[in-house]
């Protein structure tokens, strides 16, 4: 097996949208980094039945609604 071809696999802290935290192993960042989630299984519409509003990241949802709003109302 070749050496030094795999990414560094280390512990990071993951912070969920509700503030709860857990530690996991990942190739993200470097040892001890924190990954702040903007959406997680507790808030994602696919797992919550779609009852929560989508976050407007970068105005994408607003642009979509202004472009296709007439079709959505029908």
From Swiss-Prot:
Domain of life according to the entry: Bacteria
Q: Which GO terms describe its biological process?
A: translation
* GO MF term list: rRNA binding; structural constituent of ribosome
Sorted UniProt keywords: Ribonucleoprotein, Ribosomal protein, RNA-binding, rRNA-binding
What's an example GO cellular component term for this entry?
ribosome
PROSITE patterns from the UniProt entry: RIBOSOMAL_L31
Q: What does this protein do?
A: Binds the 23S rRNA.
- PANTHER family with a match to the protein in the record: 50S RIBOSOMAL PROTEIN L31, CHLOROPLASTIC, LARGE RIBOSOMAL SUBUNIT PROTEIN BL31A
Assembly and interactions? Part of the 50S ribosomal subunit.
Belongs to which family? Belongs to the bacterial ribosomal protein bL31 family. Type A subfamily.
This chain belongs to the protein called: Large ribosomal subunit protein bL31
Q: Which gene encodes it?
A: rpmE
């Amino acid at each position: 097996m070749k050496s030094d071809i795999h990414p560094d696999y280390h512990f990071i802290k993951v912070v969920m949208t509700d503030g709860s935290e857990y530690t996991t192993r990942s190739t993200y960042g470097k040892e001890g980094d924190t990954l702040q989630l903007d959406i997680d299984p507790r808030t994602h519409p696919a797992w919550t039945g779609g009852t929560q509003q989508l976050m407007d990241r970068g105005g994408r949802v607003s642009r979509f609604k202004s472009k296709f709003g007439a079709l959505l109302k029908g």
